[in-house]
Amino acid sequence: MHTYTRACCMGGWYGRETRKRNSHKKVTKRAVEKRKQDSTRQKRRTGAWRPFHDCCCHLGSSVFSRPRAAKSPPFSPSVRAPTDQPADSPAGASGERRGSSDLGKLLNPCVFIW
C-alpha cells in the first residue's frame, strides 16, 4: 500500500513500478498487459488505490481537503508547512487508518504549498 503513495510523490503512480519490475526479464507484452489489468482490477475492488489521494503531489488531494481547509482559519501554513512536508509521505498509509479529521490536517499544508 505504501509503495503507491511514494510512487505518486515521485511523479508516476503504478506504471513506473511495473516497468521497473519487468525490465530485467523477457516478458511478452500480452502477459504484462494482463498482469497490469488484473492488478488494477484488484486495487479497485480492495480500495487500495486510496493512498493515491493522501499524496500532496496529486491534484486530487487539494480537491479532497478544500472544504476542510476553508473551515480552519487558525491553521497557519507558513509556520506548519516546512515541518509537515517531510512527514507527509510516510504518514500517507497510516493517516488513512487514523480517521478523516487527521487526514484533513495532514493534507492542509499541501493545499497551501501546491
Curated annotation (Swiss-Prot):
Residue spans of biased composition, Basic residues class: 18-29
Biased composition (Basic and acidic residues): 30-41
Residue segments, region Disordered: 18-47, 65-108
Name of the protein in question: Uncharacterized protein IRL5
Native source species: Human cytomegalovirus (strain AD169) (HHV-5)
Source organism phylogeny: Viruses, Duplodnaviria, Heunggongvirae, Peploviricota, Herviviricetes
